[in-house]
């Protein structure tokens, strides 16, 4: 038996001679060492969860309840607030203790994962096939691979149902559309109609359609999670019980690198969808926590100046702008009354502070004259001055504006980071898919190891 002290552990499976991969090729050294690969993955999970817990506590320590979350550069607390923890009417934070608990739970979990990762990387068996056949595998074993796929799908389905249970039974989640400016509520009347749920998938991705990103009520979102959770769990059971069909055995490449490329492609798609969701959707990502969307900030500016000039005596229904179109109000291509000026391009925006002022034909002139509430004015003025502008290097504001306030919206951060991550994951997919296909066809070249520069360098040790 191999132990820490009998010397064999030192290098096998870790150096270029025994694996064909140098240290910097990462987990490629562990392709055939299922026990060590398990250690690498568990340790990686520990690092992820440690970051989540530490960053969570960092945000709690720096949090100022009097300022909106999006003014404080927070990226984790908005997610917890969206799940209904610690917030009350209007998205006001009334209790930060749940956030503290979340951070501590993640830190404790990361310690457990870290221990498990180090154990399996250093002490545990190099391969699992002999001692723990249930957890062992061979990459070419198609039946085992689809069983593992099935287990993963079931875990994803359980994750979807956790959100359903939180929203429906355990305290509810934050609904930005609740009357009077948002509140936490239980989602009980779920949308389970397949025509509505799958109708989102059939929508055009453009304009007022917006594909699944256009979802704007929580009943649809939570009902969608019921459908997704059910499909994932049933699909998982199916993949555990069945073997791949002949067409799948022929069509797919069955190697570790191929599975890596499939996973990277899936994560890339998730990243691009998340980018669009966080940028455009103010229901799943409430503006109270993440700041307004771009269209929302633009429409808020038009609304704010309509309110101001109407108080100063302007007739907002008939005033002409410099182009001859309406200065404050105009008509959309389909005839609705919309805000005039540059914000006309964002006429499809729907936001909780604006919808009460719409009638059957768009913005209702009589409501704009008589029904505007103070909370709508306050909120739009706040959103107008917090547009999601800014760049990845945290320089906020319009690029051409010399007096811009250095503010970067969490929406900018989350959307750009997920776009960039989605892009790099896609490049990784192409790279590994190409290598996997070449290996399967038997013509991979790789780098000529005989003339690699590193071979002529002095060893580091």
Curated annotation (Swiss-Prot):
Cross-referenced InterPro entries: PS_antenna-like (IPR000932), PS_II_antenna-like_sf (IPR036001), PSII_PsbC (IPR005869), PSII_PsbC_sf (IPR044900)
Positions of post-translational N-acetylthreonine modification: 3
Propeptide: 1-2
Source taxon at top rank: Eukaryota
Subcellular location per the Swiss-Prot or TrEMBL entry: Plastid, Chloroplast thylakoid membrane
Cofactor binding summary note: Binds multiple chlorophylls and provides some of the ligands for the Ca-4Mn-5O cluster of the oxygen-evolving complex. It may also provide a ligand for a Cl- that is required for oxygen evolution. PSII binds additional chlorophylls, carotenoids and specific lipids.
Modified residues (Phosphothreonine): 3
Name of the protein: Photosystem II CP43 reaction center protein
Lineage: Eukaryota, Viridiplantae, Streptophyta, Embryophyta, Tracheophyta
Gene transcribed to yield this protein: psbC
